[in-house]
Structures are given as C-alpha cells and as structure tokens.
Amino acid sequence: MKKPLRTSLLMLCLATPLAALAAGVDEAAIRATEQAGGEWLSHGRTYAEQRFSPLKQIDASNVRSLGLAWYMDLDNTRGLEATPLFHDGVIYTSMSWSRVIAVDAASGKELWRYDPEVAKVKARTSCCDAVNRGVALWGDKVYVGTLDGRLIALDAKTGKAIWSQQTTDPAKPYSITGAPRVVKGKVIIGNGGAEYGVRGFVSAYDADTGKLAWRFYTVPGDPALPYEHPELREAAKTWQGDQYWKLGGGGTVWDSMAYDPELDLLYVGTGNGSPWNREVRSPGGGDNLYLSSILAIRPDTGKLAWHYQVTPGDSWDFTATQQITLAELNIDGKPRKVLMQAPKNGFFYVLDRTNGKLISAEKFGKVTWAEKVDLATGRPVEAPGVRYEKEPIVMWPSPFGAHNWHSMSFNPGTGLVYIPYQEVPGVYRNEGKDFVTRKAFNTAAGFADATDVPAAVVSGALLAWDPVKQKAAWKVPYPTHWNGGTLSTAGNLVFQGTAAGQMHAYSADKGEALWQFEAQSGIVAAPMTFELAGRQYVAIMAGWGGVATLTGGESMNLPGMKNRSRLLVFALDGKAQLPPPAPAPAKVERVPQPVTAAPEQVQAGKQLYGQFCSVCHGMGTISGGLIPDLRQSSDATREHFQQIVLQGALKPLGMPSFDDSLKPEEVEQIKLYVMSREYEDYMARHKAAP
C-alpha cells in the first residue's frame, strides 16, 4: 500500500537539511533576536550590539557542569578576533587573512571554506595583525571585508563568491579588519590605515548587487577640490595648516557600529588622526572633525544627523572605534534612549542617542591626560603639558587604550556593562620638524619610545560598570592586558577568555568565579551563545594575536600566551577533551658579542626599528611570539639581513621588501640596534642569575 502523498511530502521535508530550507536573514529576523536568543545573526547579536543573550539553560547554578562539546583545529597562526554567527544550524566565522568557514554546529564538521587569497605582504600596511573580526549575514549571503580592502558576498550554502567590490584605493595603504553590518539591505563597511597616512570613510553597498549606495568621508580632503558632501565644509573649519590632506588625516571607521531601527540611525565610531600628533597634521590646533567621534548617520542616504567628538584634536591614538552599545536606562527617574561607549581615552560615555547630547562621562580606569569631561561643554579638561609639544610625557592610558576593540557586553537584568579593561601607560614625544612621512608607522609621536614601558606597570581586568551611577560594581584583576571580549546572559553569567589562555565564567551580579577552562591558547575574541535542538552552546574563537602581541614587549610573554587556533564549543555535560599541547622547543642560548658601533648609530637604529619593525617584531625587539624575535635570529639571517630587508628574500613567507623606504646604511643601523638589544638582555639575565 502506498503512503499518502501528504505523508511522503512531510517525510521528505523532515529529511531535508535545515540549511536548505532556511529562511534568509533580514531585518525582521535580526530584530526578533531581541527576545529570542536561539540565533546569533549579527556581530553584536542584535542591532543594539549589547552582546547579551536571553538564553539561560546554562546559568550560575549549573555552569560548573559546562564542558567542551566539540572543537575544531584551525590552520591559523595569527590572531583570531571574530565573533562567530549562527543561523539555522550553521556557524559562520572568519580567520586571519580574511578567510571564512562554515561549520555544522551539531557535529563540528566543516561545510565549506573561502580564501580570498590576500597577499601576505599586505600585512606591512596593516597596523594590527592580519586579523578579521567577523562576517555578516543577509538573505542567502555571507559578507566579509578583506585585509586588502575588498568587500565580498558569498553564497551561504556553498561559500562561492557572488560579487566582490574593491572598497578602497589599492594603491594606498588601506586595510579592513572589522566586521560588516547590514542595515536595510545595505552592507556597511569601513576601513583602517590611519597610521600609514590614509583618509577615513565609511561606505554602504547594495547587499544584492554590490553597487555603492553612498560614502561618508570622516575628514576633509584637499580644500582646492569640491567637498564630497556638505558636512565636510564645516569639518574643514576645524583643521589648520596646508598639509593635513596630504598626510591623510585619518579618522578611519575600523570597527564599531550599531543601529536603531526606530530612530532609523546608524551609529559609527571614527579613529585617530594621521599622524597621531596634532601639532604635525594640524599646526595651530583645532578639533579636527570628525576624528575620534561618534557619528549618527541616516542609513538610506549617508547624511549626518548628529555627531559627538569624544577626544577633540586627538594626539594620542584615542579612537572612538570601541564598541557602541544601545540601551534604555532609567536616568533621574526617566527612561532614556542612550548610547554607551568606553573608548580608549578612559572615560565611560552615556549619550542621548536621539540627539547626541552628553548625559554623563566618568573615568572608568586610570586616566591622567584629562581631569574630567565638562558636562556643560561635553569636552575633556586636559592636564597641563599633555600634548607633549615641549617635552616627552608618560601618561595613562596608552595607545592600547583603557579599553580597545575587545567587545564589552551589557546585561539589562543587572544593569551593568562588562568591560575588558586594561591599564597601560603611554610614552609620547613630539617629533615635530624632524618628522618625515614614510611608508611605515607614521605617528610623529615617538612611537619607538614606547619600548621603555616596563611590564610591571601593565595590567588588565574584567570591570563591571554601572552606567547610571557611573562607578564600578565589581572588578576581577588580570596580570596583563589584551584579554578577550565579554558575553553576558540571562543565566546571570559573564563569559570571557584571557590572554593567559583561560576561558572564564563569572556571576554577572557579583563577579564570583564559577568556572574555568584551559584553552591552551591566548584568547582575544569574544564568546557567543546559541541554541540548537533545545541545547544551549557557548562558542569562542581561540587564537592569540592582534596588535599587542605583534608589538610585543615583556607584558606579552607570559605563560599561556600561545597561538593554538581552534573553534571551541561548550555545552552542559560536554565530554570532549583537548589533546595535550606539544612541548615547547628547547631554546639554545647564543653568547652575543658587545656592539662596538658608535652610540648614535645604535640610537638611529632604535628610531628606525620603532617606525618600521616594531609593529610586527615587537617593541624593544621583544616579540610577542607570533613573528620571529630578531634578537634570536640566526647567524645566517644576520649575514643576509640586507637581502631580506631590501631585496625581499623572504617575501614568500610574508616578509616584505623595504627597498622603497630604507637605505642600506639604515638597515645596518637597525641590525646594530637589534644586536645591541640582544647583548643587553643577555647581560641582564646573567647578572640577575644566582
């Protein structure tokens, strides 16, 4: 007897993979996640970017039973900064070099991968590692920005490229590391590169066709040319001199965005000036709009509704690109639609997101560059001499910031914001008339001098901050900075990975340590959570990296700071186990010889190293472990130093040629500095030995 057709069709549907039946992601689906926590469809989970999940199967009472459900080894040796997305049983995430993978969330099986084949030498003009912070979903497509400035749409089922747009001028040192967002059918993407002399902008592309819809420049260009949009005419009045457009200006939109569908406002954060030192890029002062600002933009047209400048006339790399979070807070007995940000400069800002008016701003950590933010003017009250015009200064925070890109989260239940706080001093020196723009790290702020910051004064913490009272609720200290982002849940939990290689769960209300997992790799990314077949999971990309690990220094050489790249997925009663890590290779210590060159030659090498080499090989020649430590380079490497640096002998391995920027005598000075540092450190170790 044949089965009724109706029954046969039902069985066919049940047997069909969910991905094949999946409804496309749209605005309604993303907005629905505000109440339903099963899926994670956008970078910060919802348009508000709260990184809070209403899921509570895993809670403070049972999180001790959390275990590894499965893991996936990744062919990745650089930093993993992405927050995975989850839709209809599939995890979508990105790795270094802008590669994308889709993974079956139940089994951990790879479904497809896409490699945009970014040239490895592109890392030379990417300030902060070959990282990527994630992808976007819309309709039946996955979107990724690439390190070389492309925006690519992929088929969500197959990973095949559908369209690709070069969003930047490939002849200029732009890069993309941030995750795209999709708003009203438009893919929003920014870029980075201010340290190398670019002009910032944010663009919107049609999600279906890839056609450019609009572009908003964050700083003015050549005043002899027409302004691209009227906002730039007003911005130009806040710049001085006749060089700023030649130096790039900066203001890149390299990370944070949020969207309010009811107000129909897209919020984006802008970055630092190019170069950092205002005295060089805009002699005579000025606020330099729209650097270090929060912009509210109409997503249909790209028109500016309002702006708030976090750090006027920035001279310290105090970006406003840190996470923007939207919420409703009860302030003075009234509900307010607010925007919250804890940017690099160390003040926690609460703004009225309808008009950009400042509600409150207080220090959330050690801040010496400014006394306070004047609520009447919305401007910081700067400390004397903080702009280092006359003499070098040491101040807090540093260019790493009191909070960097590592995601914070807001829990509406506790009313607290969970911030990956870091305390690192900055050293700044005015290079002034001696500054020369080169194809290198152009700060004009004495970047090489930051090598003198000792590890003993560096620390980090998980900070629970009350945005209404503007004070800390609790704090968990860590031995160093550059810890991962946070996730908070309705289960009264906060999850965070650390630089030292642990994944933690704390109670969201009190900060009590409830659970810990040894991840075998430093973690910089933020966790996410999803539900599949009635079971809640927590996932994180574990892979040590990012700018702090490249610039290195003593504080980036703690135990656990390794890169063993994996996608880790946890659930209650998970039974999977990581294999034991391979033992570290034995180090053979060389007995170096003292450098007999003139001190001025070594000092010149130090300045050149700071500008050209430190961003990859580590400040003070102390590598963070991802890129070779030049103090330990072999005799053969030293012998062929000129060929490597100028002729590109190691270009296939990602070491670019600097023949367009350095002279042979300068390369020799760099080598002398490296050798002198090797000798200094060797003598210091043996002098300290018992």
Curated annotation (Swiss-Prot):
Heme c binds at residues 613, 616-617, 655. Binds 1 PQQ group per subunit. PQQ is inserted between disulfide Cys-127-Cys-128 and the plane of Trp-254. It is an enzyme of class 1 (oxidoreductase). Induction: By 1-butanol. Primary and secondary C3,C4 alcohols as well as butyraldehyde. Coiled coil: none annotated. Residues 1-22 form the signal peptide. Residues 600-678 form the Cytochrome c domain. GO terms for cellular component: membrane; outer membrane-bounded periplasmic space. GO terms for molecular function: calcium ion binding; electron transfer activity; heme binding; metal ion binding; oxidoreductase activity; oxidoreductase activity, acting on CH-OH group of donors; pyrroloquinoline quinone binding. Pyrroloquinoline quinone binds at residues 81, 133, 177, 193-194, 252, 344, 404-405, 547. Its EC number is 1.1.9.1. PROSITE patterns: BACTERIAL_PQQ_2, CYTC. Optimum pH is 8.0. The active site is at residue 317. SMART domains: PQQ (SM00564). Inhibited by 10 mM 1-butanol. Its cofactor is pyrroloquinoline quinone; Ca(2+); heme c. Keywords: Calcium, Disulfide bond, Heme, Iron, Metal-binding, Oxidoreductase, Periplasm, PQQ, Signal. Disulfide bonds join 127-128. CDD domains: PQQ_ADH_II (cd10279). Catalyzes the dye-linked oxidation of primary alcohols to the corresponding aldehydes and the (subsequent) oxidation of the aldehydes to carboxylic acids. Reacts with 1,2-propanediol and 1,3-propanediol but not with sugar alcohols such as D-sorbitol. Belongs to the bacterial PQQ dehydrogenase family. Monomer. This is Quinohemoprotein alcohol dehydrogenase ADH IIB. It comes from Pseudomonas putida. The lineage of its organism: Bacteria, Pseudomonadati, Pseudomonadota, Gammaproteobacteria, Pseudomonadales.
